[in-house]
Design a protein with these regions (language model features):
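Solvent-exposed, low-complexity, repeat-rich "mucin-like" stalks and linkers
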Residues: 46-76
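Short structured motifs
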Residues: 51-53, 67, 82-86, 209-211
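Serine/threonine-rich, repeat-prone extracellular segments and beta-strand-based repeat modules
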Residues: 74-115
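Disulfide-stabilized cysteine-rich extracellular repeat microdomains
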Residues: 28, 33-36, 40, 55, ...
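Bacterial Sec-dependent N-terminal signal peptides
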Residues: 5-52, 107, 114, 120, ...
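Ser/Thr/Gly/Pro-rich, low-complexity flexible regions
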Residues: 120-248
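Residue-level recognition of well-ordered beta-strand positions that form the cores
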Residues: 70, 101, 114-116, 129, ...
Length: 248
């Protein structure tokens, strides 16, 4: 009986002493699934962290200022970070990826940032040239200026119309000449523009009621609006719909 007990104890000690040692951290490059006891041998690629948010948004045409990233070894020593922002194209709306990487003797770590380039309010602002198929019944100004409205989702088209009606006896003896008249208030949502119904009063001689909607292109230098209008001015009055293209 004593011999059997000694054999059991010896066997238990042998089993205990044979437990496999190694790296038990799944994040280490040398992690061992078979290891039951960590022996402090774990090795790691650099720990890398973004400066700033993982997602950033800028308007088309803006300068992208990259915030970079930092990396350290497991012992706290710093590691140089390589940045690849070659994919970012600020001249075209879209989502782009910036990749950061850092290496040591155990391998390479990487992390990414998403840069969203969008059509924003500033892309709508400025002087534009208009081409259209509207005709005299909806006499758009060929060179309006767009300015920011009261909020970030509002813009104003200054000098919406350009009207030239020669004198007509009795009806309009002095004619009507407005080089740049009226302001159009519109709302924007990214590359979308909406012109709610509004009325332009042409010096009390008639009105132009209109509304519309449209879209800006991905490069922020052209947009199109489909208008619906009803013009009560003498000589050029009429109702209908047309399309205008604004370009920079």
């Amino acid at each position: 009986m004593r011999l059997l007990l000694l054999l059991l104890i010896a066997g238990g000690l042998t089993i205990t002493s044979c437990k496999r040692k190694g790296c038990t951290d799944p994040t280490a490059v040398n992690y061992s699934e078979k290891a039951k006891k960590d022996d402090g041998s774990c090795n790691y690629t650099p720990f890398i962290q973004l400066n700033g948010a993982a997602t950033t948004t800028i308007n088309v045409g803006d300068v992208y200022n990259d915030l970079g990233a930092v990396a350290n070894n497991a012992d706290g020593t710093s590691v140089p970070v390589a940045t690849d922002a070659s994919n970012v194209n600020t001249s075209v709306a879209g989502s782009y990826i910036v990749t950061y990487s850092a290496s040591n003797e155990f391998g390479t770590s990487s992390i990414q940032r998403t840069v969203n380039v969008i059509i924003g309010q500033s892309n709508w602002e400025g002087f534009w040239t208009v081409t259209d198929n509207c005709g005299g019944a909806f006499p758009l100004n060929a060179t309006p200026e767009i300015t920011a409205g009261g909020g970030s989702a509002e813009i104003v088209i200054d000098g919406m119309f350009s009207i030239a009606i020669d004198p007509v006896p009795i009806i309009l003896p002095n004619g009507l000449y407005i080089a740049s008249g009226g302001t159009c208030n519109a709302t924007i949502d990214g590359n979308q523009i909406t012109v709610q119904q509004q009325v332009y009063d042409a010096l009390g001689l008639g009105t132009i009621t209109y509304s519309g909607s449209g879209t800006m292109n991905a490069t922020g230098d052209s947009f199109t609006i489909d208008y619906t209008y009803d013009n009560s001015l003498p000589v050029i009055g009429g109702a209908g719909s047309c399309t205008a293209t604004y370009t920079k």
